[in-house]
Protein backbone atom coordinates (compact mmCIF):
# COMPACT_ATOMS: atom_id res chain seq x y z
CA UNK A 1 0.00 0.00 0.00
CA UNK A 2 1.11 3.57 -0.64
CA UNK A 3 2.26 5.85 2.16
CA UNK A 4 -0.59 7.64 3.96
CA UNK A 5 -1.58 10.98 2.46
CA UNK A 6 -3.32 13.88 4.23
CA UNK A 7 -5.91 16.06 2.49
CA UNK A 8 -7.30 19.16 4.24
CA UNK A 9 -10.95 20.00 3.55
CA UNK A 10 -11.97 23.16 5.40
CA UNK A 11 -11.11 22.52 9.04
CA UNK A 12 -11.13 18.73 8.59
CA UNK A 13 -8.26 16.38 7.77
CA UNK A 14 -8.84 13.34 5.59
CA UNK A 15 -6.13 10.70 5.74
CA UNK A 16 -5.88 8.26 2.87
CA UNK A 17 -4.22 5.09 4.09
CA UNK A 18 -4.57 2.05 6.29
CA UNK A 19 -5.82 3.09 9.74
CA UNK A 20 -3.27 0.73 11.30
CA UNK A 21 -0.52 2.88 9.74
CA UNK A 22 -2.14 6.27 10.33
CA UNK A 23 -3.57 5.98 13.89
CA UNK A 24 -0.20 5.64 15.68
CA UNK A 25 1.02 8.87 14.02
CA UNK A 26 -1.93 11.05 15.07
CA UNK A 27 -2.22 13.02 18.31
CA UNK A 28 -4.84 11.87 20.80
CA UNK A 29 -8.36 13.08 19.92
CA UNK A 30 -11.32 13.98 22.11
CA UNK A 31 -13.61 11.33 20.63
CA UNK A 32 -13.64 8.44 18.20
CA UNK A 33 -17.09 7.94 16.73
CA UNK A 34 -16.99 5.12 14.24
CA UNK A 35 -18.88 2.37 12.47
CA UNK A 36 -16.17 -0.18 11.64
CA UNK A 37 -16.69 -3.34 9.61
CA UNK A 38 -18.01 -5.92 12.06
CA UNK A 39 -18.15 -8.96 9.86
CA UNK A 40 -21.88 -9.27 9.42
CA UNK A 41 -21.61 -9.62 5.65
CA UNK A 42 -24.73 -9.21 3.55
CA UNK A 43 -27.11 -12.02 2.74
CA UNK A 44 -26.20 -12.62 -0.87
CA UNK A 45 -29.30 -14.77 -1.39
CA UNK A 46 -31.53 -11.73 -0.86
CA UNK A 47 -29.92 -10.00 -3.83
CA UNK A 48 -30.05 -13.13 -5.96
CA UNK A 49 -33.77 -13.37 -5.39
CA UNK A 50 -34.22 -10.10 -7.28
CA UNK A 51 -32.21 -11.44 -10.21
CA UNK A 52 -29.51 -8.79 -9.78
CA UNK A 53 -25.76 -9.28 -9.84
CA UNK A 54 -23.89 -6.07 -9.20
CA UNK A 55 -20.65 -6.89 -7.36
CA UNK A 56 -21.11 -4.72 -4.29
CA UNK A 57 -23.49 -2.11 -5.66
CA UNK A 58 -27.10 -1.34 -4.89
CA UNK A 59 -29.23 -3.74 -6.87
CA UNK A 60 -32.81 -3.37 -8.11
CA UNK A 61 -35.62 -3.46 -5.56
CA UNK A 62 -33.39 -2.00 -2.82
CA UNK A 63 -31.30 -5.15 -2.43
CA UNK A 64 -27.55 -5.15 -1.99
CA UNK A 65 -24.91 -7.60 -3.07
CA UNK A 66 -21.81 -7.71 -0.86
CA UNK A 67 -18.36 -7.59 -2.33
CA UNK A 68 -16.40 -8.92 0.65
CA UNK A 69 -15.61 -5.67 2.50
CA UNK A 70 -17.59 -6.76 5.58
CA UNK A 71 -16.96 -10.50 5.65
CA UNK A 72 -14.63 -10.26 8.67
CA UNK A 73 -14.73 -7.98 11.73
CA UNK A 74 -11.83 -5.69 12.51
CA UNK A 75 -9.19 -7.27 14.73
CA UNK A 76 -8.42 -6.68 18.39
CA UNK A 77 -5.35 -4.68 17.32
CA UNK A 78 -7.73 -2.18 15.67
CA UNK A 79 -9.81 -1.90 18.86
CA UNK A 80 -6.69 -1.38 20.99
CA UNK A 81 -5.44 1.40 18.68
CA UNK A 82 -8.85 3.09 18.67
CA UNK A 83 -9.14 3.08 22.47
CA UNK A 84 -5.57 4.36 22.88
CA UNK A 85 -6.21 7.24 20.45
CA UNK A 86 -9.05 8.98 22.30
CA UNK A 87 -10.62 10.12 25.54
CA UNK A 88 -14.14 8.99 24.59
CA UNK A 89 -15.31 6.40 22.10
CA UNK A 90 -18.55 5.40 20.39
CA UNK A 91 -18.15 2.19 18.40
CA UNK A 92 -21.11 0.88 16.43
CA UNK A 93 -21.31 -2.89 16.38
CA UNK A 94 -19.56 -3.00 19.74
CA UNK A 95 -21.51 -6.16 20.53
CA UNK A 96 -19.36 -7.93 17.90
CA UNK A 97 -16.02 -7.07 19.56
CA UNK A 98 -14.17 -7.69 22.81
CA UNK A 99 -14.43 -4.36 24.63
CA UNK A 100 -14.22 -3.27 28.26
CA UNK A 101 -17.44 -3.40 30.30
CA UNK A 102 -19.58 -0.30 29.85
CA UNK A 103 -22.52 1.16 31.70
CA UNK A 104 -23.47 3.26 28.66
CA UNK A 105 -24.50 1.83 25.34
CA UNK A 106 -26.11 3.95 22.65
CA UNK A 107 -29.12 2.20 21.14
CA UNK A 108 -30.48 3.19 17.75
CA UNK A 109 -34.07 1.93 17.44
CA UNK A 110 -34.63 1.83 13.67
CA UNK A 111 -38.41 1.40 13.97
CA UNK A 112 -38.43 -1.21 11.21
CA UNK A 113 -39.43 -4.78 10.63
CA UNK A 114 -38.39 -7.30 8.05
CA UNK A 115 -34.91 -8.59 7.22
CA UNK A 116 -32.93 -5.94 9.12
CA UNK A 117 -32.26 -5.72 12.87
CA UNK A 118 -34.71 -3.69 14.97
CA UNK A 119 -31.86 -1.87 16.73
CA UNK A 120 -28.15 -1.26 16.45
CA UNK A 121 -25.86 -1.03 19.46
CA UNK A 122 -22.93 1.31 19.88
CA UNK A 123 -20.47 0.60 22.71
CA UNK A 124 -19.20 3.64 24.58
CA UNK A 125 -16.88 4.49 27.42
CA UNK A 126 -19.10 7.46 28.31
CA UNK A 127 -19.97 7.99 31.96
CA UNK A 128 -23.76 8.14 31.62
CA UNK A 129 -26.75 5.78 31.52
CA UNK A 130 -27.80 3.89 28.40
CA UNK A 131 -29.28 6.22 25.77
CA UNK A 132 -31.72 5.42 22.94
CA UNK A 133 -32.72 7.26 19.79
CA UNK A 134 -35.64 6.35 17.55
CA UNK A 135 -34.96 6.99 13.88
CA UNK A 136 -36.83 5.10 11.19
CA UNK A 137 -34.42 3.52 8.73
CA UNK A 138 -34.87 0.54 6.47
CA UNK A 139 -31.65 -0.69 4.91
CA UNK A 140 -30.34 1.75 2.35
CA UNK A 141 -33.39 4.01 2.33
CA UNK A 142 -34.94 6.04 5.10
CA UNK A 143 -38.68 5.97 4.60
CA UNK A 144 -39.89 9.45 3.73
CA UNK A 145 -36.40 10.92 3.93
CA UNK A 146 -33.96 12.58 1.60
CA UNK A 147 -30.86 10.60 2.59
CA UNK A 148 -30.13 8.01 -0.08
CA UNK A 149 -26.66 6.66 -0.54
CA UNK A 150 -26.72 3.05 -1.64
CA UNK A 151 -24.32 1.99 1.14
CA UNK A 152 -25.78 -1.10 2.85
CA UNK A 153 -24.99 -0.03 6.41
CA UNK A 154 -25.22 3.73 6.12
CA UNK A 155 -26.11 5.50 9.33
CA UNK A 156 -28.49 8.48 9.09
CA UNK A 157 -26.77 11.82 9.58
CA UNK A 158 -29.15 12.58 12.47
CA UNK A 159 -28.10 9.41 14.30
CA UNK A 160 -24.40 10.21 13.90
CA UNK A 161 -24.98 13.82 15.02
CA UNK A 162 -26.81 12.47 18.09
CA UNK A 163 -23.81 10.23 18.86
CA UNK A 164 -21.51 13.26 18.73
CA UNK A 165 -23.86 15.13 21.09
CA UNK A 166 -23.54 12.29 23.62
CA UNK A 167 -19.80 12.92 23.96
CA UNK A 168 -18.42 15.61 26.30
CA UNK A 169 -18.15 18.52 23.86
CA UNK A 170 -15.47 17.01 21.62
CA UNK A 171 -13.29 19.45 19.68
CA UNK A 172 -11.56 16.74 17.64
CA UNK A 173 -13.42 13.68 16.36
CA UNK A 174 -11.87 10.74 14.55
CA UNK A 175 -13.47 8.06 12.40
CA UNK A 176 -10.67 5.67 11.39
CA UNK A 177 -12.88 3.73 8.98
CA UNK A 178 -14.48 6.56 6.99
CA UNK A 179 -17.82 5.79 8.52
CA UNK A 180 -20.48 3.89 6.78
CA UNK A 181 -21.39 6.22 3.99
CA UNK A 182 -22.84 9.00 6.15
In which residue ranges do the predicted regions lie?
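Class I S-adenosyl-L-methionine
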Residues: 25-34, 38-67, 74-77, 83-182
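Short, flexible coil/linker segments at or flanking structured domains
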Residues: 2-3, 7, 11, 57, ...
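SAM-dependent nucleic-acid methyltransferase catalytic core
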Residues: 1-33
Amino acid sequence: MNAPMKIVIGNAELWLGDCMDVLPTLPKVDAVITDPPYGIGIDRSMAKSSGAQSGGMAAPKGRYIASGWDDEPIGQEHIDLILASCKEAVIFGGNYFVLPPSKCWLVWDKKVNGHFADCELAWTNLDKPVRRIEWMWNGMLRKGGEERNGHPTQKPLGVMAWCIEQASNPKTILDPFMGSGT
